[in-house]
Amino acid sequence: MEERILLDFNKKIEDILPYIHKYYPDADSTHIYKWEESNALEYKYINGEKYYFKNAAPNLFRIDSTCKKLKEAVDGEEKVGRKKIIKEHITEVLNEYNDTHNHLLTPYQATFTYRISIDNGMNCDTIKVWLPYPREDCPRQTDIKLLSCNNFIINQKSIHSSAYIEKKYHNNTTFKIKYKFTTYAEYHPLPNNLKHIAADTILFKEYISERAPHIIFSDKIKQKTDSIIGSETRPYFQARKIFESLRKEYPWASAREYSTIDNIPEYVLEQKHGDCGQISLLFITMCRYKKIPARWQSGFMLHPNYENLHDWAEIYIEGMGWIPVDPSFGVQEWGTTEEEKYFYFGGIDAFRMIVNSDWGGELHPKKIYSRSENVDFQRGECETETNNLYFNKWKYSFDVYLNK
């Protein structure tokens, strides 16, 4: 664990100052202290010395509102292209829903190629890898077909869908898999006749319960959730209040490895920022505390030119069923209607690949050594006959081609 933390916290003050001064030339020790105190500049003492998170400097200009404005004045707003894609796509999805009243809409055919390349110089005989593979049990993800891969085992039994491969190690060892599938957008508007009753606590016990170490109804979680919800008693609107609040209050920032965090939702409350998975776990925890069934879903987002790992959630609303919620995409401020603004509360775009239906499960075949990522499963996992191979021992890459 110490090695993992050292890889994440590997910057000294002299390493991060050039980036900070690029956008904030007058920043001095007083500013640094203020940012550290507000947790906008993440650091940790290791062996008596202060080290900053490897992405602390870029994160500062995402977390601190003043710094964010200074950077935008120089570079422009982040991810403008993705916002344009999302706006056009949501408009198309809503138009199609209004015409058809189907919940699965605007399908795309995706061709996905994934690679893991092992570093040279390993002292081992065999490499075992688990690669991400699209789930077959999700209605909005269909027609899955393997296109190329040798000597593999496909696992659909676990909450983590994977393709397992092993081969003899040599320098430049690379594992590759290619598959295609159809992916749909999904949309569930609020029904006019929704009765706003609580879900069956016995039937959905698993999804309203605590699950250590990350889904714990601590006093902090209870107090924060209650302050967000206030006097609202309807489950749908309780969850929507949480959804609306989290993105406003906890800006997105690059995250340290989940395996180094004792309790992720508590970490978000303390640090006042989080990435997609951290915010989703906080959302799930808050919903479960209020007896709203909630569960994890994750994989990849496939927005053209913005492809990346991504996590989100689902909640169960009596009279609607399970509906998707993406807390990190949040309220769409450009929207002029409720449907546009709250699209990601009850809706999700078609640019997704679903790999995981929960977090922290077992891989198949079972991994012998500890996982590099013990919460999520997206980048893959690797091990030899004697030990786990952490992320610094290999590289992953992927290509996506979308066709409508």
Model-derived regions, located:
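Terminal peptide-recognition signature
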Residues: 129, 242, 313
